A protein has these predicted regions:
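FKBP-type peptidyl-prolyl cis-trans isomerases
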Residues: 1-245
Length: 245
């Protein structure tokens, strides 16, 4: 494989020391290991080699693989999620969580000043939060299989959309010409996400112009109406008012 290849792979990723699976594409294995989640789309995934879509050690391994090849690799922390830093374990006043109507508990993930961390302990009005990545300092093991390489432009466009939206269907490829592509978006696609999609398409597929067209489909509008109705009903039960002033 080389930089710019759209490679489709299956994988199982484990923490070396414990054998714990932290990521995988195999739905049957996820169910067997009691880690299946309904909100996850299982199956082979497509990455762009050299585009920083995956950790460095995995990207380097893909460079030396071919379609149909299977390989087990070991990735050191410096090529995975980096080393642990003691200074990223901090004490946060418990009152800061109470102000947000949160009850801190060990093991829970929280956002403090827009930084994600995991609560280690709660004691004496202070909460110890670890802001290291959960896999920082850990050596990882991957079982890889290269399923194929996408070469057609439509396939590449769909792969980019799937990567950034998790196969949610929120965005779809619309009209395509030599130098321009239209991306149909749903009702809740943020500007930052559009920028990431457009930048990736321009750099790795070579399309000069990326347009986003808002498409309001009946089922999406109905879902929005239902959420609004549910919110108004809940507010009514709580004795609140849903009046726009």
């Amino acid at each position: 494989m080389k930089d710019g290849d759209f490679v489709t792979i299956d994988y199982v990723a484990r923490v070396k020391d414990t054998g714990e699976i932290f990521d995988l594409t195999d739905e049957a294995l996820a169910k067997k290991e009691s880690m299946y989640r309904e909100d996850v789309n299982y199956g082979p995934v497509t990455f762009i080699v050299g585009a920083n879509f995956v950790i460095r050690g995995l990207d380097e391994a893909l460079h030396s693989m071919e379609v149909g090849e299977k390989k087990s690799i070991e990735i050191s922390p410096d090529k995975a999620f980096g080393p642990r830093h003691d200074e990223l374990v901090k004490l946060v006043p418990e009152s800061q969580f109470k102000q947000q109507d949160m009850k801190p508990s060990p093991g829970a993930f929280v956002n403090v000043n827009n930084i994600r961390g995991r609560i280690v302990s709660v004691s004496g009005g202070r909460v110890k939060v670890d802001f290291n990545h959960p896999l920082a300092g850990k050596t990882l093991q991957y079982e890889l299989e290269v399923k194929g390489v996408i070469t057609d432009r439509d396939g590449k466009l769909n792969a980019v959309l799937d990567y950034f939206t998790g196969k949610s269907g929120k965005v779809k490829v619309g009209k395509v010409s030599d130098n321009e592509v239209e991306i149909e978006t749903g009702v809740d696609v943020q500007r930052r996400l559009k920028e990431l999609i457009a930048t990736t398409i321009s750099k790795w597929i070579g399309v000069k112009t990326v347009k986003f067209v808002d498409v309001f489909r009946h089922e999406e509008l109905r879902q929005g109406e239902q959420k609004q109705e549910d919110g108004q009903a809940a507010e009514s039960k709580a004795g609140g008012k849903a009046v726009k002033s």
